[in-house]
Amino acid sequence: RLDARVVLLVCDRPGAYVCERAARLGVETFAFRPKDYVSKEAYEQDIVRMLDERGVELVCLAGYMRILSRVMLDAYGGRIVNIHPSLLPAFKGAHAIRDAFEYGVKVYGVTVHYVNDELDGGKIIAQRAFDYTGADVQELEAMVHAVEHPLYVEAIAGLPAGRHR
């Protein structure tokens, strides 16, 4: 269990299943289309305003495949965490599972890290490794996600309350 309360889900894909799940759980959702804004900074300003209005202490990214601008980093730097499907610093970026699979690594894993201005380059909070020698990238993806979910909760639970910098 996590001693925290989810106060807002921000999603850049209106209609995504996560929005439906959040609504069923009573979590407020802000779903937006980036193309409806003049710039990344413009939609991030809206996000920061909503986070500030709700007193958000920690921003947890999951499946948010966009690089954050200075707007978010300046407002919430040291208070943004991300889950990444590789043992960082190896296999940064959006195709980490496929890249690691094609490279032929035998030990895979996931990383929870702070977000900074370097792609998947923030301070590592937690990692978990596992062996995989199969030949099916979809099976590997399923294994990665099975490891990601509990590790993310454990890592967030282990952060000192109110001291995320």
Please report, for each region that a protein language model flagged, where it lies by residue.
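Short, surface-exposed acidic-centric catalytic microdomains
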Residues: 1-46
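Short, surface-exposed connector motifs at secondary-structure boundaries
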Residues: 1-5, 54-56, 79-81
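Donor/substrate-binding cores of folate-linked one-carbon enzymes
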Residues: 12, 58, 62-164
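Anion (oxyanion) recognition and catalysis
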Residues: 23, 52, 101
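Generic alpha-helical structural signal
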Residues: 23, 45-48, 141, 153
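Short phosphate-binding loop-to-helix
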Residues: 35-61, 66
